[in-house]
Amino acid sequence: EECEREKPPEGLAMDFIKRQFEIGEPEKDLCLIAQGLVCMGPATTSICGAQCPKVGIPCQGCYGPTKAVEDQGAKMISAIASDFGVEKDKTVDPEKVAEQLDDIVGTFYTYTLPASLIPMRVHKGGK
């Protein structure tokens, strides 16, 4: 764990997902996930020193998944669902959580879609 941002003592919990422009500049020391931003840091190889979160930008996962993670996007989707309490609180609608994300594949698979577990079709002629 390279990120120096503080996680709340009660653990991460989200009530909403926001985009960076919606919150402006995030709180300086508080975990970006705790502020409602999707940050790929927890599922990303930590060799960069968490440079993006240091300056208030959520990690996009550009160094790929950790060795312990087979599918980076699936891991983050699971983490976000956990942060919303989908597993414990049966009143949380997983579809409502997903609706808050404009582009699930683009958000969680920006750098790793070809290696993901998402089944893809290859059409003749490359289309």
Curated annotation (Swiss-Prot):
Alphabetical list of InterPro entries matching this protein: Hydrogenase_assoc-protein
EC numbers for this chain: 1.12.99.-
Tagged with keyword Metal-binding: no
Superkingdom of source: Archaea
Keyword annotations: Oxidoreductase
UniProt KW Oxidoreductase keyword: yes
GO MF: oxidoreductase activity
Subunit-structure text: The F420-non-reducing hydrogenase is composed of three subunits; MvhA, MvhD and MvhG. It forms a complex with the heterodisulfide reductase (hdr).
Family indicated by similarity: Belongs to the [NiFe]/[NiFeSe] hydrogenase small subunit family.
Job description of the protein: Part of a complex that provides reducing equivalents for heterodisulfide reductase.
Protein name, UniProt field: F420-non-reducing hydrogenase subunit G
